[in-house]
């Protein structure tokens, strides 16, 4: 009845392949801002996360950071890390840059980013955070919730690492930090459509959103719900409100540009 998945690229592809059906729900319209749901009612965000910078405050001056392009500055050569461009979160980040700035400027971004890598991309987002804390690199591009998970993991090493690094929200003077989501849609031939809609309505209610925010350290999509304590401690930030379908449209182009720019 329901497809639930992470990443706007996956939700957009499901819509393009005609796997989802449109839903009209006043409850969902009230619970979810318009840029976080499909204009045809085929998918709806349930949680969201920011693609942000985690940095070592001993070696990085945050006054020198700005948008994602700031990581291509010569002063950051040999200091930046992130995971592979084949990862869905980096594909969607690059797709959002293409949507805002076009292909030519996005290729410049990729080439500049790769030129500043401290190492070839490897590992997941937690591995990038650990590498920053260990001194292998100075700044990483990661999803926000990974730091929250590490800070509350019960693993003393990871909890200490989470205290050592700092968070920076990119593009606060321009587009806002890139947002990705986990979302849900009703499958095209769902036998229990009405109950499926009720489930998504519940998942975006204040009650469920509070539980999700506290449980996985993602940002709630329902504006009435506050994030978990550690997430809130990073401060409020400006998020990119581009309709996420515009990001999904550029996912394939993002793969091409990452390949052309040698982002492994």
Language-model region placement:
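A structural signal for short loop-to-beta-strand junctions that line the ligand-binding cleft
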Residues: 1-6, 21-53, 69, 80-81
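Ligand-binding pocket segment of bilobal, Venus flytrap-like solute-binding proteins
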Residues: 85, 92, 96-170
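Short beta-strand->loop
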Residues: 21-29, 43-44, 69, 139, ...
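Ligand-binding clamshell of periplasmic/extracellular solute-binding protein-like
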Residues: 1-21, 140-147
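Extracellular/periplasmic bilobal clamshell ligand-binding domains
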Residues: 227-264
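Periplasmic-binding protein-like
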Residues: 78-86, 202-226
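Short loop->beta-strand "edge-of-pocket" segments that line small-molecule binding or catalytic clefts
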Residues: 70-88, 96-98
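A bilobed periplasmic-binding-protein/Venus flytrap-type ligand-binding module shared by bacterial periplasmic
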Residues: 52-59, 179-192, 211-212
């Amino acid at each position: 009845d329901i497809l639930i998945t992470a990443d706007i690229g996956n939700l957009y592809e499901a819509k393009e392949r005609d796997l989802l059906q449109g839903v009209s729900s006043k409850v969902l319209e009230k619970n979810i801002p318009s840029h976080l749901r499909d204009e045809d009612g085929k998918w709806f965000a349930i949680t969201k996360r920011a693609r942000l910078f985690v940095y070592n405050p001993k070696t990085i001056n945050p006054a020198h950071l700005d948008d994602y392009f700031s990581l291509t500055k010569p002063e950051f050569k040999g200091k930046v890390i992130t995971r592979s461009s084949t990862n869905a979160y980096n594909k969607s980040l690059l797709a959002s840059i293409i949507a805002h700035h076009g292909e030519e400027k996005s290729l410049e971004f990729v080439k500049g980013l790769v030129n500043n890598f401290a190492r070839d991309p490897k590992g997941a987002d937690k591995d990038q955070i650990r590498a920053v804390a260990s001194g292998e690199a100075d700044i990483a591009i990661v999803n926000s919730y990974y730091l929250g998970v590490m800070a509350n993991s019960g693993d003393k090493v990871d909890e200490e690492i989470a205290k050592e690094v700092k968070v920076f929200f990119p593009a606060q003077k321009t587009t806002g930090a890139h947002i990705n989501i986990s979302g849900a849609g009703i499958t095209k031939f769902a036998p229990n459509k009405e109950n499926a809609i009720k489930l998504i309505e519940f998942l975006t209610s204040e009650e469920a959103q509070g539980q999700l925010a506290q449980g996985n350290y993602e940002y709630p999509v329902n504006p009435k719900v506050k994030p978990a304590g550690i997430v809130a401690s990073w401060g409020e930030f400006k998020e990119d409100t581009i309709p996420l379908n515009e990001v999904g449209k550029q996912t394939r182009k993002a793969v091409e540009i990452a390949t052309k720019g040698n982002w492994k």
